Amino acid sequence: MRKVIGIGETILDIIFRNNRPHTAVPGGSTFNGLISLGRLGVPVSFISEVGNDRVGDIIRDFMMENNLSTRYVDRFPDGKSPISLAFLDDDSNANYTFYKEYPKQRLDVPMPEINEDDIFIYGSYYSLNPALRGRMVEFLNYARQRKAILYYDPNFRKA
């Protein structure tokens, strides 16, 4: 059966309404799409990284509750899981502030099993980040060699 493998950032979004915390939910551009696929019963694996901290636990648990494999999620001991503060205006448009503290060694995970016609999803700034470029190229070359379908989601937003 065809499966979906995605790579991208995971972050805990803390959403504010009227300058007060309203809710907190895990997110990320590629992550959000994969969550939807997992909820539909599509076999999904996610390549990502979170800290070995309480926020990382929340993100990991959310992934498992929504049928995403966490086998390829790096739980780094140095640094902290990323957090975003999303301040909603009266029209529910968000203005974001990000807090990120990654270790020097990034995406320390094995290559996932990828077969012909599997779908490999990547996107957003995460896939263009100079700190991850070498590792991202490794994953993309690996997926291409195995004849996976490569799908790039630029995650453009209205400015």
Per-region residue spans from a language model:
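Positively charged, low-complexity intrinsically disordered leader regions
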Residues: 1-17
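Substrate-binding N-lobe of the ribokinase-like
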Residues: 3, 17-84, 88-93, 100-105
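Acidic active-site catalytic centers that drive phospho-/nucleotidyl reactions
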Residues: 9, 13, 32, 153
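Residue-level signal for short, function-critical loop segments
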Residues: 10, 50, 126-128
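Short, glycine/acidic-enriched loop or turn micro-motifs at the edges of active sites
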Residues: 12, 16, 52, 156
